[in-house]
Every structure is written in C-alpha cells, then in structure tokens.
C-alpha cells in the first residue's frame, strides 16, 4: 500500500452519481415493461463447467456443517434464475455482483456488476430487439446493426467459419500475425475464437452496437441449436467500440442435452489439466420439471456505464476495483 491515496475510491464521486442514475434508469426500463426484479444467491454448491471460466471457491464450516460445504461464488446468476423460471416466475431480471477468478485490467475486474434477464416465449430476435432498445436508451446511440457469425467472418476475413478446416483457419491466423500461436492449437473452436478476437471484433460496432448471432453449434454453451441450420446455435453477442457488452441465448430446455454438455465440458477440463467442476443438478431438475421456452441475456453493467460516461477504463466507474479493496 505504497500509494498514500489508495484509500480513495477508484472512480470520482461525480461518476458514481452518474452510475447511480444509470442503475435507476435500468430499473425503470424493466418496470415499464412489467419485468420482475429478483435476487438470487451469490454462492452455490455447483458452478460453471465451461473450460474458459474460473470461479472463486470457498468453504462453509459453520454450525450444521461440521464436515464443511464447498461453495462457489457465482460467475453469473443464470442457474438460479432459470430455476425461478421453471417455478413460474414469468419475465425476470437481476442486477447483481458476479465473480470470475480471471483478469483484471482496463475492461476486467474479478468482481463486477451483471444485468441478466429472461423472457419466456421470446425468440432470440425479439430479445435482440429489446437489448437494442436498452442500449439506445442508456447510451443514446443509433440502432444496432445485426449480422450472423458467418457473415462477420466472410465480410472481414473472407472465410466461411462453418466450413473452413483447421489448415484454412491457420492460414488466416498467419495473415493476422498469429501464425505461431495458431500452429500450436489443435482445437478448432479455439482457432475460431482467435480469429474472431483478432480479425472481427476490431472491425464491428465502431459507430453503433453490433449484434453477432448464430455462433457455431460447437460454441452453444446453454443455447438451443437452430432448427433451421444445425451447424449454428441460437446465441448472440453484442459489441460496441471494441467492448463485448452482452451474451445471450435462446435457452436450452432439454435437461438430458444440458447434462451431456456439462459432462463434455468436464472432459475438456480434464484434458486441459483443469479440475472438473460439480454439475448443478438443481438446474437439471428444474429443466426436467419444465422450464418454459425462453431467451435470456447477460450484460456487463460496468462496461455499459463506462461507455455511457465515455470513460477510459472500468476503474473510472467502479467505486473500488480489486487493487483498492
């Protein structure tokens, strides 16, 4: 603690006042649309299995748990919120803290604010329109552009991501200056993600938000596969001014398929030398009981506020970043 002013907030009080106004505006947006605000636990006995996500882990040893209970800070409120959907909540949203034991920097903090909402009986496109409405209201930006994952690659990299083989993907990576890295990578989806980050993200969403939809089925996560094209998933992401803002799905409702995906994730984790994670059987039971067809999205509030305030980094809009807490 060599910085004598390190007790001070990361953000200015003026920015924190503006942040509070944006939070109130978000709540009004959903209140006007009849969406219920909910609160769910920040900890769980299960966690995400995604090989690219790293949760914080703790252990409860209080009265009634002499043997101890392993708990994980939530990387997103998704699993609990889907249980509410299955219980008949109707449309819901949540503003909450989420935690990822990963990066810190200009656009990352291990503790961050998430806006997540779910719309029963919405398809992916209807939810995209609602996200666009929120962005226009908060950011005062132009209506977004939309393009498929395939269109994005064809437009900016002149390659079809749904049919290209690994050799062709490596050739494009070479042109982008990442040939050595690509040559060491055997996973096709990782190669696609590399090309997306290097060749697509910098080119989209410069003047207005960009929605990219229909990611490859192999990157479906918790999304349904498209009934029109089984090569792609009903998944979208939102980018604006070089920042990924949101990730949304038409939600998978088949518990058996979801279990298979969780188990496949854990096999990938084992192959990568990572610990396998406990599967959320409560979520699987909720899906089995009958979660309604829904679409949902998770949006990074700190990044949204950063864009709204034209700030340079997250520390300009967060009261205390991890280096000051």
Curated annotation (Swiss-Prot):
Domain of life: Bacteria
Residue ranges the record marks as coiled coil: none
Keyword Nucleus among UniProt keywords: no
Gene3D superfamilies: Bira Bifunctional Protein, Domain 2
Top-level EC class as recorded in UniProt: ligase
Pfam families, A to Z: tRNA-synt_2
GO molecular function per UniProt: acid-ammonia (or amide) ligase activity; ATP binding; lysine-tRNA ligase activity; tRNA binding
GO biological process: lysyl-tRNA aminoacylation
Similarity comment text for this entry: Belongs to the class-II aminoacyl-tRNA synthetase family. EpmA subfamily.
Gene Ontology cellular component list: cytosol
Cited InterPro entries: Aa-tRNA-synt_II, aa-tRNA-synth_II, aa-tRNA-synth_II/BPL/LPL, EpmA, Lys-tRNA-synth_II_C
Residues involved in ATP binding: 100-102, 109, 244-245, 300
Subunit structure: Homodimer.
Protein name according to UniProt: Elongation factor P--(R)-beta-lysine ligase
Biological function: With EpmB is involved in the beta-lysylation step of the post-translational modification of translation elongation factor P (EF-P). Catalyzes the ATP-dependent activation of (R)-beta-lysine produced by EpmB, forming a lysyl-adenylate, from which the beta-lysyl moiety is then transferred to the epsilon-amino group of a conserved specific lysine residue in EF-P.
EC number, as in UniProt: 6.3.2.-
Organism: Erwinia tasmaniensis (strain DSM 17950 / CFBP 7177 / CIP 109463 / NCPPB 4357 / Et1/99)
Reaction it catalyzes: D-beta-lysine + L-lysyl-[protein] + ATP = N(6)-((3R)-3,6-diaminohexanoyl)-L-lysyl-[protein] + AMP + diphosphate + H(+)
Chain sites annotated for binding substrate: 76-78, 118, 251
